[in-house]
Amino acid sequence: MKERERVLELVKKGILTSEEALILLENMATEKDEKQIEKAAEKVDTQNIGTTNKEDQVADLMNALEKGESEGPTVDSFEENTQDSAEKDRENLERILDELATKANRASAELDEVNAEIAGIKEEIKEVAEEIGTLDTKEELDALTEDEQVQRKDLHVLLAQLEEKLATQSTEKTALEEELKNIRKEQWKGQWNDTKEKVSSQFSEEWKDQATDTFNQVGGKVAEVGGQVGEFLKKTFNSFSDTMNDNVEWKDIKMKVPGVATTKFEHEFNYPNPQASLIDVKVANGTVVFKTWDQEDVKVEAKIKLYGKMAGDSPMEAFLERSDIDVDDETISFQVPNKRVKADLTFYLPKRTYDHVSVKLLNGNVLVEELTAKDVYTKSTNGTITFKKIDATMLEIEGVNGEIKVLEGTILDNIIETVNGDVSISAAPESLSVSLINGDIRITAKEKTLRRVEASSANGNIKLALPNDLGVEGQVKTNLGSINSRLTDIEVVREKKDRGNQQLHFRRVLEESMAQINASTTTGSIFLKDTDK
């Protein structure tokens, strides 16, 4: 049944008055055409003046509106105007949505470009920072040249420029993201309004009221059920937690935490018959081992580990790009100053006397199983240094954290300096100087070739064993420790045992050989004895 016929039927039954019917008919038009409907109603009302029957008045009005007898616009024309207006509104909405979509596509494309530029800048920053880190490591290894110092300054300038550019691009990215967010919000609003109008036009107000009540009831039920489920889950998890705590020893559980991606590989470097007499090894992270063999070739067994992603067609290529390896008839040079590369190197050297050997490590151990050289310098910031057998004119060892051992060999001058770690000497140096801050010093002299010993430790004991057929002139002292001597055939020249200051001056005179001994410690004790005891 049409809406107008229903209104007329209600008037006939006396449910609605003519005034109420007129108001209801006026509300059937859109808000935009209300004034036109009022004019039409007034016109129809004027034509029906004198009619005393309210039912006839409403009927005449309905006939006038349906048949178009009035001079003003009819209800059908109003509906057509309303439809035209709605169509125009829809077209405007679609046009606005198209414009918003165009703006969104443009902003999205610009954002993609900015993101690509930011990714490129970050990659450049990463490469520059890696180069700077490599040069810094070279400086720590005392291998930085003047040209590399200039290069490092230029790299720092470039890094600052890249960081400034990155900040600018990041600001632009934030602005584009905000713009795109606002556009998406406007698009959503437009689409939602369009959808809401389409949906609303399909259902009556009565149905919407019923649906609202139904959804409210359902929502209440869902909330009630959700509360019950939440309470159940809470009780379940609490029970599970108590059970796990009572029955599981968490200290026995080991969990693997994802770390930096690593690449491992092994490679063997072979160099046929080089006549090099200089060896230069500098490694940021790794272990260096020297061995000698009966062949004239040089072989280096390398175990490499690369930390993180590195550019290169292969791990070997990535390693070579970050290393400087050169072996010829003058020098055997292996330099791996990159801290993202760990290189465990084992050198097999021909048996000969080398002029100069230099080994410098930041983190790692040095092991020399056998070596003959004129001048040997070894340094490790964090790691142990061990010489099993070394024959050298000069052996200089420098450490920071780690134990130092010189077990066997003949050395003319031996200088050892370190901060933290014990020092043990059982080789046969003629001149020995040991200085450390925290750690014990143990010197065992087996040959009468010893001529001088200088040993000092701030916090640690000093143990010195001397051959009983070696003439000595010694002075030892400690502030907070004690002096204990079991040397035979010695003459005590002077002894002081004051609290906080103990000293001993002793002498054993033998015409064949004499050695000068000086040892001091602040908080430790000094122990003297014969080597054979």
Swiss-Prot record:
Cysteine pairs bridged by disulfides in the record:
none
Q: Phenotype upon knockout?
A: Deletion in the OG1RF strain causes anionic phospholipids to be redistributed away from the division septum; during exponential growth, there are increases in phosphatidylglycerol (PG), decreases in cardiolipin, with no change in lysyl-PG. Confers resistance to the antibiotic daptomycin (DAP) in the OG1RF strain. Resistant to killing of the OG1RF strain by human cathelicidin LL-37. Deletion in the OG1RF strain increases virulence in nematode C.elegans infection model.
Coiled coil, from the record: 83-186
| Region of interest (Involved in cell membrane remodeling), residue spans | 289-526
Residue span of region Binds the antibiotic daptomycin (DAP) and the antimicrobial peptide human LL-37, under physiologically relevant concentrations. Protects the OG1RF and S613 strains from LL-37-mediated killing in a concentration-dependent manner: 1-277
Q: Which Pfam families match?
A: DUF4097 (PF13349), SHOCT-like_DUF2089-C (PF22746)
Q: What induces it?
A: Probably part of a liaX-liaY-liaZ putative operon.
Signal peptide coordinates:
none
Keywords in UniProt for this one? Cell membrane, Cell wall, Coiled coil, Membrane, Secreted
Please state where this protein is localized: Secreted, Cell wall; Cell membrane; Secreted
One of the record's GO cellular component terms = extracellular region
Modification after translation is described as: May undergo proteolytic cleavage, allowing release of the N-terminal region into the extracellular environment.
* Location of the region described as Disordered in the Swiss-Prot/TrEMBL record: 63-89
Q: What is known of its domains?
A: The N-terminal region (1-277) is able to bind the antibiotic daptomycin (DAP) and the antimicrobial peptide human LL-37, under physiologically relevant concentrations. The C-terminal region (278-533) is involved in cell membrane remodeling.
What does the protein in this record do? Answer: Involved in cell membrane remodeling, perhaps acting by negative modulation of the liaFSR and liaXYZ gene clusters, thereby regulating content and localization of anionic phospholipids. Binds to the antibiotic daptomycin (DAP) and to cationic antimicrobial peptides, such as human LL-37, perhaps functioning as a sensor that activates the cell envelope stress response.
Any additional notes?
Answer: LiaX and its N-terminal region are released into the extracellular environment in daptomycin (DAP) resistant strains, such as R712.
Q: What is this protein called?
A: Putative adhesin domain-containing protein LiaX
User: What species was this sequence derived from?
Assistant: Enterococcus faecalis (strain ATCC 700802 / V583)
